[in-house]
Amino acid sequence: MKICILPGDGIGPEITAEAVRVIEALDLKFEMEEALLGGAAVDATGDPYPEATRKLAREADAVLLGAVGGPKWDTLPREQRPERGLLGIRKDLGLFANLRPAILYPELANASSLKPEVVAGLDILIVRELTGDIYFGQPRGLEVRDGERFGFNTMHYSESEIRRIGRVAFEAARKRNRRLCSVDKMNVLETTQLWRDVMIELAAEYPDVELSHMLVDNAAMQLVRAPKQFDVMVTGNMFGDILSDEASMLTGSIGMLPSASLDANNKGLYEPSHGSAPDIAGQGIANPLATILSVAMMLRYTFNQENGALRIENAVKKVLAQGLRTGDIFEPGTTKVGTKQMGDAVLAAL
């Protein structure tokens, strides 16, 4: 079982180091190899997704990523920016399904910006299509038309693209509370009219899953008004990008949230939902829990090691119950710790 480790930029190397320690502690005989992606790869090779990384990622069963990006590289040509490395590896590995849980741990209820009674017990999974939609549609560009600047993008989805992400979402809902909400904008966008039609057709294959539909503007409002009505949500690339970030902040800290991006065979790229946080890089204060929980997702979805996944998740719960907190989730009455101390505590709980 091979894992490609991509520490990336900013706090990436610090948080992946703790996740690797957790993997090693599981004694599941993983073979791990490290490579460059993002800004670190640009600095070393001039390419955000070098050929050596491409080869290693293709050969691995799973990829663990820290984070990419930072202001240092913002002035580079678009094709050389760190984020192009992330887009490149997603496309190269055929990763079309992004799974992002938004879970509020009881110990962190006060960290949420919403009232505790609104978010207590929150446990949502957002399934986002990753390879289609307006982010990748052609034609796109910037031109001058009729003497003024003109920008354009193209939104499109094929039936097969919608069907395959729909299956991932229905299967995920089947393993949870059997409720799936499909989010679209079918009242004005033909692309999402097709999305809704295909989801309705798929529902016939999953009679044990309750399917509902919601327009994206209403979904954004409902996530803040009454988020616990949702179990699994499925949506397209752009809507999912926005809604998953919104859902993540219901929990109080994006530093707690893992994510998985899967191909058709459950080979996956696993990473924390947060960014590279260059402002705190190298200080040893970043929260490694989202990356550690990403390892739990890796065990569950790619390696079918449910017991290992639960061990990690229970260890994180135990550490939180002990009152240990990194700065992003610290509150009076708890104990502030750094990145390595948090990793030590998770290892001890394991």
Curated annotation (Swiss-Prot):
Residues carrying the site annotation Important for catalysis: 135, 185
Main location: cytoplasm
Amino acids binding Mg(2+): 217, 241, 245
Stretches of the chain forming a coiled coil according to its record: none
A GO MF label: NAD binding
UniProt-annotated location(s): Cytoplasm
Binding site for NAD(+): 70-83, 275-287
Binding note for cofactor: Binds 1 Mg(2+) or Mn(2+) ion per subunit.
Cofactors demanded by this protein: Mg(2+); Mn(2+)
Reaction equation(s) it catalyzes: (2R,3S)-3-isopropylmalate + NAD(+) = 4-methyl-2-oxopentanoate + CO2 + NADH
This protein's UniProt keywords: Amino-acid biosynthesis, Branched-chain amino acid biosynthesis, Cytoplasm, Leucine biosynthesis, Magnesium, Manganese, Metal-binding, NAD, Oxidoreductase
Keyword DNA-binding set for record: no
Pfam families: Iso_dh
Binding partners and assembly: Homodimer.
Family per similarity comment: Belongs to the isocitrate and isopropylmalate dehydrogenases family. LeuB type 1 subfamily.
Protein name: 3-isopropylmalate dehydrogenase
Organism: Aromatoleum aromaticum (strain DSM 19018 / LMG 30748 / EbN1) (Azoarcus sp. (strain EbN1))
Gene: leuB
